[in-house]
Design a protein with these regions (language model features):
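Nucleotide/phosphate-binding catalytic cleft detector across ATP-hydrolyzing
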Residues: 1-212, 232-233, 242, 291-295, ...
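A mobile "lid/hinge" subdomain adjacent to the ATP/sugar-phosphate binding pocket shared
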Residues: 254-296
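A composition-driven signal for long, intrinsically disordered, charge-rich low-complexity tracts
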Residues: 10, 17-19, 24-28, 237-251, ...
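Glycine-rich phosphate-binding loop plus the immediately following alpha-helix
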Residues: 36-39, 188-192, 219, 225-269, ...
Length: 380
């Protein structure tokens, strides 16, 4: 009998968060076409990751942030990367290929990092044709109507290569998903399932925690909905806010850094300097501009604006909890918690960072874990 493989992908604008079996991994969802670039021909690319698909070569993953920290590279790839972060991305062929890269890379990482079986013949990669696939996809609430086209692309046989570093570390995929079972749900809904469902996908939330507001704050959208005591969702309370996401913060930071003298600075570089591994400052002649300090100030200001939006949309004194998840949610959490304590003191603000066993887990995985619970419950 074929082995069952459950694999879920949270398609964030900033990162793919994946769950394969019980293994969690996250990496940048940025992708650039390097078919005609020397990067695609390099013998020693370090940690760079690539997908070769139908004659084209694309780089994806975290190393892209380092590449675009250089002005020359940023100019070359700015338009392409900008489209990665547009809501129209889910219609785009490049996104479809990046999703295929996420699925393939998850399988490679499971075999080589999470479960490095000495007998390579037991690796998932070596048994692709013997696997029964169950695949979950998490999309923004406002992009759920793109799922039929995404599913149509995925539900076929795919031949591609995943390469890590040098060409000697290449995985040649013949991945037939034509008979795979798929499930797609809105990210903000599956974020709630992380908090309110057991590991087998059954709802277990204490009614005393309701009514509640669920906030999934990501790079391009802040997904919100209100859950009543009877576990119903009023559609009027569910929406995707596109004015207070991390993208908006990065754009404001870009403006301020430019005003300080670095007119060539791009919002695409904020991740690297303010939240990543890069130098927190940039220079203009003898002037040092601290990008991280600017980012922290803008973040605090936008958190207050978001709280004002919530006050206009919901009756914050009448809900028991506000559950916050997502990478941007992590950044917003201390500011929102402080504001709520001062203005709506009896409403608890909870960061979704506890797994079923009580252990601490990064809130950025809440969506994909909730999705994975639902996937396994749907296809037992």
């Amino acid at each position: 009998m074929d082995q069952k493989l459950y694999l879920s992908v949270d398609c964030g604008f900033d990162k793919f968060k994946c769950c394969i079996g019980d293994y969690l991994l996250a990496f940048s969802s940025k992708m650039i076409d390097v078919t005609n670039s020397i990067n695609a021909l390099s013998v020693a690319d370090g940690d760079n990751t690539y997908i070769e698909y139908k004659g084209s070569v694309y780089m994806f993953g975290d190393s892209i942030d380092q590449i675009i920290s250089m002005k020359s590279n940023l100019k070359m790839y700015a338009e392409e990367l900008d489209s990665n972060r547009n809501k129209q991305r889910f219609k785009d062929r490049t996104f479809h290929i990046s999703l295929l890269a996420a699925i393939g890379y998850s399988i490679v990482a499971y075999d080589t990092v999470y479960n490095p079986e000495k007998d390579v013949d037991k690796h998932l990669f070596r048994n692709l044709s013997n696997l029964q696939y169950f695949i979950g996809i998490g999309l923004p609430y406002g992009s759920m109507n793109e799922w039929p086209q995404i599913k149509e692309f995925l539900k076929q046989r795919h031949n591609f290569k995943i390469r890590r570093g040098s060409k000697s570390c290449t995985f040649d995929f013949d991945l037939d998903l034509s008979n795979a079972n798929f499930l797609c749900n809105a990210q903000v809904i599956t974020a709630f399932l992380f908090q309110g469902a057991s590991s087998d996908g059954n709802l277990t939330i204490d009614k005393k925690a309701l009514p509640c507001i669920m906030m999934d704050a990501g790079y391009k959208t802040v997904g919100l909905f209100e859950l009543a005591k009877n576990l119903s969702i009023n559609p009027e309370t569910a929406f995707s806010d596109t004015d207070h996401a991390m993208y908006n913060i990065d754009k404001y930071v870009e403006e301020k850094v430019k005003d300080a003298g670095r007119e060539d600075f791009s919002y695409l570089q904020v991740q690297y300097h303010a939240r990543g591994e890069g130098n927190p400052a940039v220079r203009k002649n003898t002037t040092v501009i601290n990008v991280k300090d600017i980012y922290e100030k803008v973040l605090a200001e936008e958190a207050i604006k978001l709280c004002s939006l919530l006050e206009g949309k919901y009756s914050l004194d009448d809900v028991e909890n506000m559950f916050i998840t997502g990478c941007t949610g992590i950044a917003y959490y201390p500011h929102i918690k402080k504001y709520m304590a001062e203005h709506h003191g009896l409403t608890k603000v909870v960061l979704t960072n506890r797994a079923d066993d009580g252990s601490e887990i990064s809130p950025m995985y809440a969506i994909v874990i909730g999705l994975h619970k639902q996937l396994k419950n749907r296809y037992k």
